[in-house]
Each structure stands twice: as structure tokens, then as C-alpha cells.
């Protein structure tokens, strides 16, 4: 099944991240890395940092639920 995001990705990215779950995981990791780099450059934590951290945490929770739900359905399909 081809998703709309497939057309936006360069071919090498499609090869590196063949499934939608690989792509979601890569996005999650990139968000984490970007947040880490930005926060490391700041001398002190501020309200903006807390808001950003909460948003990133929310995205992580959503991604975990998607992958968890898929795992449950995959197990159910595998049972005879």
C-alpha cells in the first residue's frame, strides 16, 4: 500500500525506511535529536522548553500507541 508521504520522500529515504512504522520511528528520533540539540544550546530551561518537551512527549505517546495497536492486530492475525 502506498501512502501520500511516499511521493514526498526521496528514493534513498524510501529504501532506508521501507514501512510507515520505520518512518514514524525516524521522525520521532529526529524530533528527539532536534530537541536535545536546541536544549543543549540554551543556558537555562524556560517555559518554551517545557512546552516543547510536552509536545514531543505527546507525539511519542501517539507513536507508541500506533505501534502497540499494530502489534496486537498482527498477533491476532497470526493466530489460526
UniProtKB/Swiss-Prot annotation:
What's a Pfam family in this record? Herpes_UL33
Recorded protein name is Tripartite terminase subunit 2
Q: List the disulfide bonds.
A: none
The organism is Human herpesvirus 8 type P (isolate GK18) (HHV-8)
- Kindly give the InterPro entries that the UniProt entry links to this protein: Herpes_TT2 (IPR005208)
Q: Where in the cell is it found?
A: Host nucleus
What does this gene product do?
Answer: Component of the molecular motor that translocates viral genomic DNA in empty capsid during DNA packaging. Forms a tripartite terminase complex together with TRM1 and TRM3 in the host cytoplasm. Once the complex reaches the host nucleus, it interacts with the capsid portal vertex. This portal forms a ring in which genomic DNA is translocated into the capsid.
Q: How does it assemble?
A: Associates with TRM1 and TRM3 to form the tripartite terminase complex.
Residues spanning the signal sequence = none
Amino acid at each position: 500500500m502506498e501512502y501520500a508521504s511516499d511521493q514526498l520522500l526521496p528514493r534513498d529515504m524510501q529504501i532506508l525506511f521501507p514501512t510507515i512504522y520505520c518512518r514514524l520511528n525516524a521522525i520521532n528520533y529526529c524530533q528527539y535529536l532536534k530537541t536535545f540539540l536546541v536544549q543543549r544550546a540554551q543556558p537555562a530551561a524556560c517555559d518554551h522548553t517545557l512546552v516543547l518537551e510536552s509536545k514531543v512527549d505527546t507525539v511519542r505517546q501517539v507513536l507508541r500507541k500506533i505501534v502497540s495497536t499494530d502489534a496486537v492486530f498482527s498477533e491476532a492475525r497470526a493466530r489460526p
